[in-house]
C-alpha cells in the first residue's frame, strides 16, 4: 500500500512551480535510482536543472516539509514505507561539471563520479586523487561523509565547498568549516553541496597510474563490485576492521530473504535478487547484534538508511538486544 501522496504535496507548492525548469515527479520509485534497487516511493522527487533552479525550488517548499538530497544512489538504503517530503536528485547536466581551475586544482560538481576526478588528475599529472578511483558514488557523497580508501581521504584534498541551504541561501565553506573527521563532516545537515574545489600536487603520471591500477585491482579482487550493493555497510571501529568482526561473529554469507552479507567481502551487503528494504536492514541489524554479542563492539552503519518503515515491519537497533 502506498505510504506517500506526492500529488497532494505538489499541489501545495502552488503556481510557483510553473517557473521551475527541472523535473518534478510525484510518488517516485526509489528502487530505480539506488544501487541496492530496493525501497519505497519518494513523495516528491525533484531533479533541478542547475543551481539557480535548485535555489528557486527550495524557496517554494514550506519549512515543515522534509528535504533530502541524493546523488547516484550509492551508500543509501531506502525503507519500504517511502520517503516523506522532497527528495532532490542532482543531475549530471547541472551538477556533473569537472574542470581544471588553477595549478593542481580541480573543480568538480556534486554528481561527478568519484573515479572521474581521479582520471582527470591523472591526465594532468596531479597527485593525491588516486584513492577516488576505488570509491563508488559521487563527489557530493564524498564531501558529506569524508569518503576515503586505500590511505586517502576527502578532507586531504578539499579547498572549498559550495552549497545551498534548506531556504535556498548559498554558502561557501572552507576545509576548516567542513569540520571533517572519520566518515563525517560537521557541516550543517541541511546543506546541499553543489560543487567543490580540490587541490593536489604535481606528480609523475606513471606513479599516479600505478597507484590507480593498484586500487582497481584490489577492489576487483576483494569487493563484490558487480552486485547490487551500497558499498561498505559499517564503519571501521577504531583499531579494528568491521569485516573482521563480522567474519569472526559468523556473518560472512549470512542471508535473510534476498539480502546477503557478501561471501567475498562480508562488510558489503548485497541484494541477490528482489530483496526488500526491510530484509536488507534486518540483515544489517542481525549482524550488528551478532558482533555485539561476540565481541562487545557496537558497529555503526556507514550506509545511510532513510524513509519510513512499513507498518508492522519496524526494526530496532541491534534487534533490541542493546541500547542503540
UniProtKB/Swiss-Prot annotation:
Cofactor: FAD
An example Gene Ontology biological process: regulation of cell shape
Cellular localization per UniProt: Cytoplasm
Entry annotation: catalytic residues: 183, 232, 302
Domain FAD-binding PCMH-type: 36-203
Cross-referenced InterPro entries: FAD-bd_PCMH (IPR016166), FAD-bd_PCMH-like_sf (IPR036318), FAD-bd_PCMH_sub1 (IPR016167), FAD-bd_PCMH_sub2 (IPR016169), MurB (IPR003170), MurB_C (IPR011601), MurB_C_sf (IPR036635), Oxid_FAD_bind_N (IPR006094)
UniProt GO MF annotations: FAD binding; UDP-N-acetylmuramate dehydrogenase activity
GO cellular component labels: cytosol
Organism superkingdom: Bacteria
Enzyme Commission code(s) on record: 1.3.1.98
Keyword terms, alphabetized: Cell cycle, Cell division, Cell shape, Cell wall biogenesis/degradation, Cytoplasm, FAD, Flavoprotein, NADP, Oxidoreductase, Peptidoglycan synthesis
EC class of the enzyme, as a word: oxidoreductase
Main location as per UniProt: cytoplasm
Catalytic activity from the UniProt record: UDP-N-acetyl-alpha-D-muramate + NADP(+) = UDP-N-acetyl-3-O-(1-carboxyvinyl)-alpha-D-glucosamine + NADPH + H(+)
Pathway in which this enzyme or protein is active: Cell wall biogenesis; peptidoglycan biosynthesis
Function: Cell wall formation.
Family indicated by similarity: Belongs to the MurB family.
Name of the featured protein: UDP-N-acetylenolpyruvoylglucosamine reductase
Organism (species): Sinorhizobium fredii (strain NBRC 101917 / NGR234)
Amino acid at each position: 500500500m502506498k505510504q506517500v501522496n506526492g500529488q497532494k504535496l505538489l499541489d501545495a507548492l502552488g503556481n510557483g512551480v510553473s517557473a521551475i525548469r527541472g523535473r518534478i515527479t510525484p510518488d517516485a520509485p526509489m528502487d530505480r535510482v539506488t544501487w541496492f534497487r530496493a525501497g519505497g516511493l519518494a513523495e516528491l522527487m525533484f531533479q533541478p536543472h542547475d543551481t539557480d533552479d535548485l535555489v528557486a525550488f527550495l524557496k517554494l517548499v514550506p519549512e515543515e516539509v522534509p528535504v533530502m538530497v541524493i546523488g547516484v544512489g550509492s551508500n543509501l538504503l531506502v525503507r519500504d514505507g517511502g520517503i516523506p517530503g522532497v527528495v532532490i536528485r542532482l543531475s549530471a547536466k547541472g551538477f556533473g561539471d569537472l574542470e581544471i581551475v588553477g595549478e593542481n586544482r580541480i573543480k568538480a560538481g556534486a554528481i561527478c563520479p568519484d573515479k572521474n576526478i581521479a582520471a582527470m588528475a591523472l591526465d594532468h599529472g596531479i597527485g593525491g586523487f588516486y584513492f577516488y578511483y576505488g570509491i563508488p558514488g559521487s563527489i557530493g557523497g564524498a564531501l558529506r561523509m569524508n569518503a576515503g580508501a586505500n590511505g586517502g581521504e576527502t578532507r586531504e584534498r578539499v579547498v572549498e565547498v559550495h552549497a545551498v541551504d534548506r531556504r535556498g541561501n548559498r554558502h561557501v565553506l572552507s576545509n576548516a568549516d567542513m569540520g571533517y573527521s572519520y566518515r563525517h563532516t560537521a557541516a550543517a545537515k541541511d546543506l546541499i553541496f553543489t560543487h567543490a574545489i580540490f587541490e593536489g600536487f604535481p606528480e609523475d603520471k606513471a606513479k599516479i597510474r600505478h597507484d590507480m591500477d593498484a586500487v582497481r585491482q584490489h577492489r576487483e579482487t576483494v569487493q563484490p563490485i558487480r552486485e547490487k550493493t551500497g558499498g561498505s555497510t559499517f564503519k571501521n571501529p577504531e583499531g579494528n576492521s568491521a569485516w573482521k568482526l563480522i567474519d569472526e561473529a559468523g556473518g560472512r554469507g549470512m542471508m535473510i530473504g534476498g539480502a546477503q552479507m557478501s561471501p567475498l567481502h562480508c562488510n558489503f551487503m548485497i541484494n541477490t535478487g528482489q530483496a526488500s528494504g526491510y530484509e536488507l536492514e534486518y540483515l544489517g541489524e542481525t549482524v550488528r547484534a551478532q558482533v555485539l554479542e561476540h565481541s562487545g563492539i557496537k558497529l555503526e552503519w556507514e550506509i545511510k538508511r532513510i524513509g519510513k518503515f512499513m507498518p508492522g515491519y519496524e526494526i530496532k537497533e541491534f534487534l533490541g538486544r542493546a541500547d542503540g
